[in-house]
Amino acid sequence: MRKTLLVLALLSFAGAAVADDEVFDKAYSMEGVSRVSVENVNGKIEAYAWDRPYLKVRAIKSAHGVRAQETLRLTEIRVRKAGDEIRLETVNPRRRRLFGFLDFGWQNAHVDYELHIPTLTQARLETCNGKVIATGFGNSIACDAVNGSIELKDVFGPVRATTVNGSVRIVFRGPLKDSRVETVNGSVDVAFDRASSIRYNLETVNGRIEGDFQLAVEGKFGPKEARGSYNGGAESLRCETVNGSIRLKAN
């Protein structure tokens, strides 16, 4: 009896350890398209701007457990064109029922996106469990995450970046444009050209507010905020966090 139970346990463990993956690799014309949006659930999004006139999408789906292959088969990378926008979406299978009850052994796939998007495209990137990285965009960009950091490099803006558990780091190419940054558990770092003209509003509860230029910080312990302008205040910058510091850097 003990041997039988041991064999069954080993088989169960072996089944749970099964892993599989599948690659989605396609390109789409950007004729008549000025916006691209991505909605993911579990997995990171990496987006790179380039000078080619088409969108390149590479998504790696991975799944674990005895139903790994079935999970991959039922997980869809949906691509639709609506007006001037191409929309990408990870569509997970509906949770199965077992004897009338939800099957809690079911696991959704993990999908990592790597995108190459024309430089002047407006981008909106969203994921729940994963980080967002974007580089080189010459137009507005919006990023949302729940459990994951956001890192934007060499961007023109305007920028909107929101997460719950994760830090946000933004490096502008040139002067800062209107931007809003929010997180709960994480720090905020924003770097921009010294020629920027900014009206800033910065708030944190458990953290510091710092800059390599003079900031009018109110509050020494507990909640802190800083409001003011830099070089006239033509563009707005609002940063909020609860547990983390806010740092501004003029390059």
Residue ranges with predicted function:
Residues M1-N251:
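Intrinsically disordered, low-complexity terminal regions
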